[in-house]
């Protein structure tokens, strides 16, 4: 991140959760950068994940309590970590209710068709960057919620604090606060 504050108390705002503390600096970046079509990127990623519903079922089975009830919050976090997706994509994935594996070809086909149509029309590159006038498009912009979420989740995995994202700094030990500041 280009914004860095480091004070005696690791510059963690006490009224913001760990997630909000990490994303704060990212939300303030505004510069020229490539423009991506995240709707299509997420559609392609969902199609890829849904093509292997047994993997999703395996992850969801790990999120059951002693009575066999599925913990939605834990499931979303596990999906984020297992498939490296944002929380928004993980919630969409959870909404497919893949607790039991089933044939997902009916859901995969429209997702793939949408992505293939955009690629055939030459609207996006392989990495979903928007193309205008035959060139990848850049603009002065802020990071989208999706980009911020992916960045926050990536750095939280690196410093091993992904399980503390909804906690406040006062609820963390000194070492955990230090890892949040590093992230």
Q: What role is predicted for each listed range?
A:
Residues 2-3, 9, 152:
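ABC ATPase nucleotide-binding domain
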Residues 5, 11, 160, 179-183:
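ABC ATPase nucleotide-binding domain "signature" region
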Residues 20, 26-30, 83, 94, ...:
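A short, conserved alpha-helical patch in the ABC ATPase nucleotide-binding domain
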Residues 24, 28, 32, 158-161, ...:
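Conserved amphipathic alpha-helical interaction elements at protein-protein interfaces in regulatory
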Residues 31-39:
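Flexible, disordered linker segments and immediate boundary regions flanking tandem C2H2 zinc-finger modules
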Residues 38-64, 77, 81, 102, ...:
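Conserved ABC ATPase "signature" region
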Residues 144, 163, 168-172, 176:
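Conserved ABC ATPase signature
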């Amino acid at each position: 991140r280009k914004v860095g504050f480091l004070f005696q108390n690791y510059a963690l705002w006490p009224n913001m959760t760990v997630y909000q503390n990490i994303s704060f600096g990212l939300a303030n970046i505004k510069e020229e950068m490539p423009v991506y079509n995240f709707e299509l990127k997420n559609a392609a990623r969902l199609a890829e994940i849904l093509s292997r519903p047994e993997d999703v079922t395996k992850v969801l089975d790990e999120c059951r309590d002693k009575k066999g009830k599925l913990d939605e919050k834990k499931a979303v976090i596990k999906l984020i970590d297992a498939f490296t997706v944002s929380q928004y994509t993980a919630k969409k994935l959870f909404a497919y209710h893949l607790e039991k594996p089933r044939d997902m070809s009916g859901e995969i086909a429209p997702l793939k068709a949408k992505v293939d149509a955009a690629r055939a029309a030459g609207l996006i590159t392989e990495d979903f960057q928007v193309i205008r006038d035959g060139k990848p498009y850049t603009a002065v912009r802020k990071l989208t919620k999706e980009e911020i979420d992916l960045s926050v989740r990536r750095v939280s995995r690196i410093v091993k604090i992904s399980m503390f994202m909804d906690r406040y700094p006062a609820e963390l030990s000194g070492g955990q606060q230090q890892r949040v500041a590093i992230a």
